[in-house]
Amino acid sequence: MKESSPINEERLFQEFIKLAEIASPSCRERQIADYLKKRLTELGLAVEEDDTAAKIGGNTGNLLARLPGQEGLEPLFFACHMDTVAPAEGVKVSFKEGV
């Protein structure tokens, strides 16, 4: 029997599909950046974008998202990429036998 989890697996699954299907080739991550800014803001994070795009000839800077912590607890830091490797456009996620 599967243990109960505070994670909504179906919501996580659907969010993964949305993210994986958004075109995001290197230096052209605008579409996924806009989606992430919207979602993170909806979740209560303060989101800003730096000026890296102008420095590297891209269309998107780095996103910095902050969520206030709680007094006495250690802070967490996450870092990730928005760009994807080829093929970065026209991707359709498919699952077979749960994978």
Description of each model-found segment:
Residues 25-72:
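A non-catalytic alpha/beta surface segment that caps or lines the substrate-entry region
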